[in-house]
């Protein structure tokens, strides 16, 4: 009797566990940097998010060193989480010098406009404050804050993620990294991932530590995003 009761209880417990706790395991990466991140670019990365998604899905890609690489098992999901600060700046400066077609692209024109604005000593003070274009000596650090440039980079990130997202097969999360300055030896980086498509994420720009280095302000931004988009 005790044996039968024990078997019943164990069977009931396991069935309950299976219902209450999902048992599927998914493999992915939530912290991937591409050439759009200044640190990755400085370390030699020249691949854009497109290549990151191809690699994650098990496709063969050519690395920044010219070699080919392929995963033995494709991932189930990925978050391309490039740094929100200076996103696309180093990459755009490089493309402007080495890629003649970049100058005529929307992103290239926005990058040039940002550089011209910074070179103008009589730049409209209103544009500086309302456009989040803060004065400093390092143009690469400010140019990315030029609103049109930032929005074009962010829209491109969302566009590529949506292109590779296949519900039920492969999940491409739109995201970025919020990167505050080092404080008391702690960076406290946060990877922000959205469950939404670009139709919603395009309604905002990534909130960075240029906007605020306090994580509570980041949470407030995300709350405003939810209220605005329903995402």
What does each model-found stretch correspond to?
Residues 19-231:
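Extended, charged catalytic domains and RNA/DNA-binding interfaces, predominantly
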Residues 3-12:
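Sec-dependent N-terminal signal peptides
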Residues 13-18:
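N-terminal signal peptide c-region/cleavage motif recognized by signal peptidases
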């Amino acid at each position: 009797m005790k044996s039968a009761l024990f078997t019943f209880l164990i069977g009931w417990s396991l069935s309950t566990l299976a219902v209450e706790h999902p048992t599927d395991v998914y493999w992915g990466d939530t912290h991937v940097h591409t050439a759009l991140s200044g640190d990755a670019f400085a370390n030699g990365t020249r691949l854009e998010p497109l290549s990151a998604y191809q690699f994650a899905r098990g496709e063969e890609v050519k690395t920044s060193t010219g070699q080919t690489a392929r995963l033995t098992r494709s991932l189930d999901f990925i978050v391309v989480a490039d740094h929100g600060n200076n996103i696309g700046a180093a990459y755009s400066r490089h493309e402007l010098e080495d890629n003649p077609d970049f100058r005529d692209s929307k992103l290239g024109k926005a990058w040039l406009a940002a550089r011209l604005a910074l070179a103008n000593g009589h730049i409209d003070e209103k544009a500086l404050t309302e456009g989040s274009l803060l004065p400093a000596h390092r143009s690469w650090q400010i140019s990315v804050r030029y609103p049109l440039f930032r929005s074009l980079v962010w829209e491109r990130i969302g566009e590529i993620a949506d292109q590779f997202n296949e519900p039920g097969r492969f999940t491409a999360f739109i995201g970025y990294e919020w990167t505050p300055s080092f404080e008391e030896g702690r960076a406290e980086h946060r990877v922000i991932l959205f469950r939404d498509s670009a139709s919603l994420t395009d309604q905002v720009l990534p909130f960075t530590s240029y906007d605020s280095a306090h994580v509570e302000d980041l949470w407030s931004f995300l709350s405003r995003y939810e209220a605005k988009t329903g995402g």
